[in-house]
């Protein structure tokens, strides 16, 4: 087996990051690789499809019950799922109280100190991407994750989040050695989505690792708390995830330091593809009805 690779999946909330990452990791496990998933999202949904569970008990919740994280054993926080994938969720505090990023820092330190990274080929961090606080940036900042894969779509805010995450990677690239592995486009069936994803990847100086087509079988599998790889292994969609896993596996050492763009450049790109029209400043703030009346 190859030496340990530490990767991370970042992306805008609701983009399908956890679903995409779990299917990709299930495919990597199917290929014979030994996997550890570290969920870094307060929703604690980064391992549910691997474990067939609603939500795994988190390190922070177990530490609170035990007294402190030092009172925990590795076996208490780590669960074994599909294809022997090891699963851990960092968790976060109650809503409105404390820093959710604290769970990420506490968890990774605990796992390192207790030998969780031994005898594995991949550690994968599944990280909330809308929030740029230090806790969530920790896998990047502390050189825990060496390859970042950004899950996005052709929607403007998903691309905006991808660009913001690239800014975070750029900030720590020289001090920590983290690199952008590429973009993964999770299709939302928006206009010219593939073209936009490829164009954004080009502007960021990276590659579109894979374009994952939209398929209802993903939702069917999720309702049963399963990956498509396990639920429908012979399906076309399962093969897409296998292809994505193969691309990630063959991408080791090929990451780049990204070249983020400005908001104006992002809007210009949308205009170039006809998604946004050039807006006259006099039209800003006008409703569709008001604009129709002006042009009548």
Curated annotation (Swiss-Prot):
Residues with the ADP-ribosylarginine modification: 102
Bound cofactor: record note: Binds 1 [4Fe-4S] cluster per dimer.
Residues reported in the UniProt entry to bind ATP: 11-18
PROSITE patterns the record matches: NIFH_FRXC_1 (PS00746), NIFH_FRXC_2 (PS00692), NIFH_FRXC_3 (PS51026)
MF-aspect GO terms: 4 iron, 4 sulfur cluster binding; ATP binding; metal ion binding; nitrogenase activity
Binding residues for [4Fe-4S] cluster: 99, 133
GO biological process, alphabetically ordered: nitrogen fixation
Keyword set includes Transmembrane: no
Keyword Iron-sulfur included in the entry's annotation: yes
E.C. code: 1.18.6.1
Record's comment on post-translational modification: The reversible ADP-ribosylation of Arg-102 inactivates the nitrogenase reductase and regulates nitrogenase activity.
Cofactor requirements of the protein: [4Fe-4S] cluster
Keyword terms, alphabetized: 4Fe-4S, ADP-ribosylation, ATP-binding, Iron, Iron-sulfur, Metal-binding, Nitrogen fixation, Nucleotide-binding, Oxidoreductase
Catalysed reactions, as listed in the record: N2 + 8 reduced [2Fe-2S]-[ferredoxin] + 16 ATP + 16 H2O = H2 + 8 oxidized [2Fe-2S]-[ferredoxin] + 2 NH4(+) + 16 ADP + 16 phosphate + 6 H(+)
Bilayer-spanning residue ranges: none
Assembly information from the UniProt record: Homodimer.
Similarity-based family: Belongs to the NifH/BchL/ChlL family.
Chain's role: The key enzymatic reactions in nitrogen fixation are catalyzed by the nitrogenase complex, which has 2 components: the iron protein and the molybdenum-iron protein.
Protein name: Nitrogenase iron protein 1
Source organism per UniProt: Azorhizobium caulinodans (strain ATCC 43989 / DSM 5975 / JCM 20966 / LMG 6465 / NBRC 14845 / NCIMB 13405 / ORS 571)
